[in-house]
């Protein structure tokens, strides 16, 4: 009887040891899965940087700078086609800078604020009306004010490039050439920067930005030149 009992104990002990050794290995996998499902934030991953809010104002800054450069350069070239005076081109470029910066800021503020309302309502529904862990989730929402300021400042910075390059040049041909040259350099720079940040092809992005800017300036110049020729 003692031999049989020892045999049963000896036969059962390896399985018990296997279960004891298997449990510690299974627990970290479950913890890792829970951490991954919670958002992928770990102590060594970025130090808790809020990339959602950063991407929001970075996108607004890039779009604002590109819009400011293309719109003001096209406006100055178009006005120069109809009215070749330096004052007309300078005033039109300055008006485009101020109006465009205000428009971009207001539009970005309204759109981001609407996005925040939608995300906040979604978070509230997911929490089921509870206030637990609400502070951490609310911090992940993008800031409408930051996006509006970034959009306005970037638009003004992009618009200032063609304005300063051609607004104070007296000869008409040199003025238009300066605006086009400064705009081309700025467009190429924005294309390369956006491609580098996004991990895309640098050359293709730069060419795409250049072609788009040249097309906008050419269309504006052609339309206003047509109006100027007919005395409108």
Swiss-Prot record:
Domain of life, per UniProt, equals: Eukaryota
Carries keyword Plastid? no
Query: What Pfam families would the database entry show?
Result: VIT1 (PF01988)
- GO CC, any one term: vacuolar membrane
Q: Which cysteines form disulfides?
A: none
Give GO MF terms, alphabetically: iron ion transmembrane transporter activity; manganese ion transmembrane transporter activity
Instruction: Please report the name of this protein according to its UniProt entry.
Output: Vacuolar iron transporter homolog 1
Q: Which organism is it from?
A: Oryza sativa subsp. japonica
């Amino acid at each position: 009887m003692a031999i049989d009992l020892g045999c049963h104990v000896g036969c059962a002990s390896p399985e018990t040891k296997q279960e004891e050794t298997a449990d510690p290995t299974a627990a970290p996998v479950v913890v890792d899965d829970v951490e991954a499902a919670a958002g992928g934030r770990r102590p060594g991953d970025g130090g808790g940087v809020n990339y959602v809010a950063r991407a929001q104002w970075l996108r607004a800054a890039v779009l604002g700078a590109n819009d400011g450069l293309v719109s003001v350069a096209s406006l100055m070239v178009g006005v120069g086609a109809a009215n070749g005076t330096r004052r007309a081109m300078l005033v039109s470029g300055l008006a485009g800078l101020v109006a465009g910066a205000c428009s971009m800021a207001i539009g970005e503020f309204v759109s981001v604020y609407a996005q925040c309302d939608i995300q906040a309502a979604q978070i509230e529904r997911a929490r089921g009306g509870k206030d637990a862990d609400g502070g951490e989730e609310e911090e992940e929402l993008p800031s409408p004010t930051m996006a509006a300021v970034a959009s306005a400042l970037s638009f003004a910075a992009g618009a200032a490039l063609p304005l300063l390059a051609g607004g104070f040049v007296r000869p008409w041909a040199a003025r238009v050439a300066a605006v086009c040259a400064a705009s081309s350099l700025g467009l190429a720079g924005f294309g390369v920067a956006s491609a580098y940040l996004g991990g895309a092809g640098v050359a293709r992005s730069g060419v795409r930005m250049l072609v788009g800017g040249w097309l906008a300036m050419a269309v504006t110049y052609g339309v206003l030149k047509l109006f100027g020729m007919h005395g409108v």
